[in-house]
């Protein structure tokens, strides 16, 4: 089995190996993008709001793949508003406001004891 087929099976899309983009859902397209990146055997993967344009039903599919990558030891830098995911999977969490890092901490400290007033306000609205 070639690497493409192994990776497609890993993200639950083996049957889509020959599909065109127009035949894929948003969540499937995101998982295919992850597969394409994994084919290059990266040391680090960067994600910029990977779920922001997805229907709510598709978000879980993409987060599941990313969760698996994290559990396998893949280093990931993820820009996200998915706070539950950041808390569960992150080893460091940063809050960026107006283009500046306002707070950086472990997930436990970040979510349970935020020091920055703007972060406290943000978390009170999204959690």
Question: Whereabouts are the PLM-identified features?
Answer:
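Helical segment within the ABC ATPase nucleotide-binding domain
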Residues: 59-72
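Conserved signature/switch motifs of ABC ATPase nucleotide-binding domains
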Residues: 19-22, 40, 72
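H-loop/switch region of ABC-family ATPase nucleotide-binding domains
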Residues: 80-81
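Catalytic Walker B motif of ABC-type/P-loop ATPase nucleotide-binding domains
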Residues: 45-48
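Hydrophobic anchor residue at the start of the ABC signature
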Residues: 34
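A short, surface-exposed alpha-helical micro-motif characterized by mixed small hydrophobic
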Residues: 86-88
């Amino acid at each position: 089995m070639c690497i493409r087929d192994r990776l497609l099976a890993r993200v639950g899309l083996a049957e889509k190996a020959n599909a065109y983009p127009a035949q894929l859902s948003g969540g499937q397209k995101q998982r295919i993008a992850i597969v394409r990146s994994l084919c290059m055997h990266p040391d680090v993967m960067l994600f910029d709001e990977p779920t922001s344009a997805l229907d709510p039903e598709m978000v879980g599919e993409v987060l599941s793949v990313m969760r698996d990558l994290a559990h396998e030891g893949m280093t990931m830098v993820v820009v996200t508003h998915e706070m539950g995911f950041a808390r569960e999977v992150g080893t460091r969490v940063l809050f960026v406001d107006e283009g500046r890092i306002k707070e950086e901490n472990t997930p436990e400290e970040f979510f349970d004891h935020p020091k920055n007033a703007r972060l406290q306000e943000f978390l009170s609205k999204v959690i």
